């Protein structure tokens, strides 16, 4: 099973209809291959169990097993963040709409505070860590990158990216900036 492509704007292009635009490469190949050439992958090693479990339940009906133990997380990080996944609510930080995108200054403040905490912990432990700061909106990623560049994070190698541009990469620590926070329960395209 493969995660479906984002097809919110699927249109007919070059003679292909919307249904064909939604078809994944695996959807196309599997019926055309002999059974001996098809194998379902049931184990994942990249994500921590908290994130891997969420992905397994939401997309793979609980069939994807996590093989990366949470004990692999560095001790200096476990001391400050006892759980591998932390959600921080920012209900009083509404997003600001830009042309076709969004930013959220209050959430940027929270991300910077978390980075400073991680930098402090890594520095005290004399360790280095790679950190991905990921946002669903390009304007938020740009604003975060600009603010991060103004600070010093000597123990951290930080990459700021959108969800799409970070796909397939990995980091020791990931911070996801949801960006949208509103009382209308507007989810945006995420």
Which functions belong to the PLM regions below?
Residues 1-190:
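Conserved helicase motor core of SF1/SF2 NTP-dependent helicases
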């Amino acid at each position: 099973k493969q995660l479906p492509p984002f097809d919110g704007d699927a249109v007919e292009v070059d003679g292909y209809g919307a249904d064909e635009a939604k078809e994944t490469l695996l959807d196309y190949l599997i019926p055309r291959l002999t059974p001996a050439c098809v194998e379902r992958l049931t184990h994942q090693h990249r994500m921590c169990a908290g994130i891997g479990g969420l992905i397994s339940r939401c997309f793979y009906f609980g069939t994807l097993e996590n093989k990366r133990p949470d004990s692999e997380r560095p001790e200096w990080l476990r001391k400050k963040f006892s759980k591998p996944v932390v959600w921080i609510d920012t209900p009083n930080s509404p997003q600001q709409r830009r042309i076709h995108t969004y930013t959220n200054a209050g959430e940027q403040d929270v991300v910077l505070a978390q980075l400073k905490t991680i930098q402090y912990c890594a520095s005290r432990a004399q360790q280095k860590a790679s950190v991905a700061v990921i946002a669903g909106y390009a304007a938020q990623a740009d604003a975060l990158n600009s603010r991060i560049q103004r600070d010093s994070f000597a123990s951290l190698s930080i990459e700021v990216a959108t969800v799409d541009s970070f796909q397939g990469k990995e980091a020791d620590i990931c911070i996801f900036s949801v960006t949208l926070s509103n009382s209308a329960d507007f989810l945006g395209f995420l």
